Amino acid sequence: MPDFLGHAENPLREEEWARLNETVIQVARRSLVGRRILDIYGPLGAGVQTVPYDEFQGVSPGAVDIVGEQETAMVFTDARKFKTIPIIYKDFLLHWRDIEAARTHNMPLDVSAAAGAAALCAQQEDELIFYGDARLGYEGLMTANGRLTVPLGDWTSPGGGFQAIVEATRKLNEQGHFGPYAVVLSPRLYSQLHRIYEKTGVLEIETIRQLASDGVYQSNRLRGESGVVVSTGRENMDLAVSMDMVAAYLGASRMNHPFRVLEALLLRIKHPDAICTLEGAGATERR
């Protein structure tokens, strides 16, 4: 364990520390949505503070030739920046009496506070992935400059959601992004897809899954009635992770024991036109 995660005065026994960290990991896996549609770049190491942030050009097909002399349009970095990887964190407290009671009565240590901190960190990670952070200068999938948009349409009518997502995949296809596609929707829109699609006897969401083979998900971080369709793959976007979600001990305070759940990561958008947001009838086609 790195020294900065567990100080020498850490009060937990080895099995208690393992239980705490396993709880953090389980909650993160259950809660995170953005990672389900993104490739991971890393972990790079907790000391890595910056990462290249490239935007690429070149989506024309590869060449076919006998001797390999035919010229092709090269995939190249159109713009390169270096961005600082932000830290996402949430603190929690374990009371010394709870630790002693668990040991005295030979009971598992209650790590509910760690689970709560991990869930809140997971929510903030998805917030960063979908909306970025304007104060720190980070873009998200819903706010990226150069993304495509389509009108949301009327999802209260059967087939309305399916038609909107068909239109989004069509626009992505026109930009040279042929999938596989993934869809993330706000809970309100997601719930409206659980109805029989016309006279097929099939739920509308199942019809959409045939278009979006990388999954159809809901996220409570998406606001109001909104959604996003992406062409997945690290050639289009990925999540640069320097440190994955883990617990650290902060040192004793008034006999009690504060801990921190933390991670360090950054969404890297390489092809903004591999993203198509569903933003309502007044949305502009491209930003």
Curated annotation (Swiss-Prot):
The keyword Transport applies. InterPro entries: ENCAP (IPR007544), Encapsulin_nc (IPR051429). Transmembrane segments: none annotated. The keyword Nucleotidyltransferase does not apply. The 32 nm encapsulin nanocompartment is formed by 180 subunits; monomers form pentamers which assemble to form shells. There are 36 pores where the pentamers meet as well as 3-fold axis channels and dimer channels. The N-terminus of the protein is inside the shell. Belongs to the encapsulin family. Family 1 subfamily. This is Type 1 encapsulin shell protein EncA. It comes from Myxococcus xanthus (strain DK1622). The gene is encA.
